[in-house]
Every structure is written in C-alpha cells, then in structure tokens.
Amino acid sequence: MSWQTYVDDHLMCDIDGHRLTAAAIIGHDGSVWAQSSSFPQFKSDEVAAVMKDFDEPGSLAPTGLHLGGTKYMVIQGEPGAVIRGKKGSGGITVKKTGQALIIGIYDEPLTPGQCNMIVERLGDYLLDQGL
C-alpha cells in the first residue's frame, strides 16, 4: 500500500459525513511521504520544532505549534507520543511513530476527539508495523 493510500483512505476518511481538513505523513526530517491536496506548505524549522517537543515535551507550549504559517495553541497531549493544538474552532493532532509524523488538521463540525482518533489509530497501526 502506498503512503498516499494511507492518507487518502485512512486519514481523509469520512466520519459521520465529515472529514479532516488536511492530513499528511512526513518523515522525522520533514520530507513529505504523502499528503492531502489541502495540506499547507510548511517550513523545515516548523517540523524541527515539533520534533524537539517530542524529545523535550513542553518546549512548544510557550510559542505554540506552527505549521504552514498557522499558529496553534498547544493543549494536553501525550509527552513524547502525541502533540495536540487548537486554533479557533479547529486544531491539529500530530502522532510520532518510529520513522514518521502523522498529522491531521481539522475544523468544525469535526471534533478534536474525532481528529485524535483518526490520527492516533493510524499512528498506532504504523508503530505496530515497526514504522
């Protein structure tokens, strides 16, 4: 299965008639493995800051999580495993696997819990596969 299929079928899936706004699977180095057409263009330093927060949980809290020029307020996640952010009625979930970052961006009517479930379910599956 291609990485794009994981994005298209597992991240951009339909939940009660709604779906994520954007999603991607990127390497720890910031290289894009696959992304939805709506995923924002991001900078390598934004990914580096996310990776730093996985190594040093809480490092993003003072500045926020920035992706594609959008700033998200960092909210409770799972240190070293999941970073969650909020912006207005939407937000972001980032799940770290052994080799990749699984990223989902959502807006209402999708809920934070639905985004977390979609992103973390795929991340857990990839971790189980040694990825």
Curated annotation (Swiss-Prot):
Domain of life, per lineage: Eukaryota
Protein location: Cytoplasm, Cytoskeleton
A molecular-function term among this protein's GO annotations: actin monomer binding
Keywords: Actin-binding, Allergen, Cytoplasm, Cytoskeleton
UniProt cross-references to SMART domains, sorted A to Z: PROF
Keyword Transferase attached: no
Chief location bin: cytoplasm
Keyword check for Protein transport: no
GO CC annotation terms, alphabetical: cell cortex; cytoskeleton
SUPFAM superfamilies: Profilin (actin-binding protein) (SSF55770)
Family: Belongs to the profilin family.
Biological role stated in the UniProt entry: Binds to actin and affects the structure of the cytoskeleton. At high concentrations, profilin prevents the polymerization of actin, whereas it enhances it at low concentrations. By binding to PIP2, it inhibits the formation of IP3 and DG.
Complex formation: Occurs in many kinds of cells as a complex with monomeric actin in a 1:1 ratio.
Protein name: Profilin-6
